[in-house]
Regions:
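Active-site-adjacent "gating/activation" loops or surface patches in catalytic cores
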Residues: 1-45
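Divalent metal-dependent catalytic cores for phosphoryl transfer on phosphate-bearing substrates
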Residues: 28-161
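Extended, charge-enriched "interface" segments that sit outside catalytic cores
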Residues: 160, 164-175
Length: 175
């Protein structure tokens, strides 16, 4: 059920955070502990499938639910936007990594256009891995991990490069 899956996703996040994971997830263990607000990842894990069974696209329905939740609890605009984006886009990284060529620069360009920040990339990577691992133990394997990691690393390089170029143009404008 969705409830069981949600508990497994959150459990996986916690195990990753404290390091109770396969050694192949060492980088992910380090990354999850560098997230600025890990509670947003946990909330994304709780909310990501909440729209299922309500008729329509569960990602979009979940996005609306999380927006109301954040508003009711006076979350900052930034945190509301990040959490809503994560819920709405929680399937994108898995889909792109498994249905397109993660080595193709065009794939990376299109993916990073949607993600557009390193912060979102880090969160969506953590959510995606723990979502897949929480779905069915046989769904998670080294092939899927390698594809996701390749998409993550290539996207991180591209976003870092864009950030450096943006900073250089800001400095040039100030001269």
């Amino acid at each position: 059920t969705v409830d069981e899956h949600t508990f497994k996703v959150v459990r996986n996040m916690r195990q990753m955070q404290i390091g109770k994971v396969d050694p192949s997830l060492k980088i992910e263990h380090e990354l999850i502990n560098k997230l600025p607000k890990i509670e947003l990842l946990y909330l994304a894990g709780i909310f990501h499938d909440l729209g299922k069974g309500k008729g329509g696209d569960h990602s979009e329905i979940g996005e609306k639910i999380v927006e109301k939740f954040c508003k009711r609890l006076n979350f900052s605009i930034h945190d509301t936007e990040l959490l809503s984006w994560l819920v709405k886009n929680h399937l994108i990284m898995s889909s792109i990594s498994q249905k397109t060529d993660v080595h193709d620069p065009e794939t990376i360009k299109n993916f990073t256009k949607n993600v557009n920040t390193l912060e979102k990339l880090n969160y969506i990577y953590m959510l995606t891995i723990n979502d897949i691992r929480g779905t069915n133990p046989t769904l998670w394997n080294s092939w899927k991990h390698d594809l996701l990691k390749q998409l993550f690393m290539s996207s991180r390089r591209k976003l870092n490069l864009e950030e450096v170029q943006s900073n250089k143009s800001i400095v040039a404008e100030r001269k």
